[in-house]
């Protein structure tokens, strides 16, 4: 009887710890979640604040912000949703690409 009780007292905490470890291993960071959908939602910038608890996402104005918010709601961990406030900025991606090309052209040291 004592052997069974001791075995039970050893086995239960081990199972609980392995379950917790598996749950923690399956959690993705907010950046991993967002990186998986960059092309689908036209995401061109992501900033995750360390001191300011905010995730700021820049996305193509032709894509659906509502669908992006729904995706984040379904895929971010509960802890991330509680910790971070999410800001989504929409802009014309063609305009941004043009500005980036002009910047590179103006700052190219090999002219």
From Swiss-Prot:
Domain of life (superkingdom): Bacteria
Entry keyword set: Signal
Signal peptide: 1-25
Protein name, UniProt field: SPbeta prophage-derived uncharacterized protein YolC
């Amino acid at each position: 009887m004592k052997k069974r009780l001791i075995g039970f007292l050893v086995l239960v905490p081990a199972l609980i710890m392995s379950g917790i470890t598996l749950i923690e291993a399956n959690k993705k960071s907010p950046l991993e979640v967002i990186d998986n959908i960059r092309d689908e939602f036209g995401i061109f910038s992501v900033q995750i604040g360390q001191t300011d608890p905010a995730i700021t996402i820049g996305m193509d104005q032709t894509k659906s912000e509502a669908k992006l918010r729904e995706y984040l709601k379904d895929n971010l961990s509960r802890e991330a949703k509680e910790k971070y406030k999410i800001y989504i900025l929409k802009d014309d991606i063609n305009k941004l690409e043009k500005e980036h090309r002009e910047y590179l052209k103006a700052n190219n040291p090999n002219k």
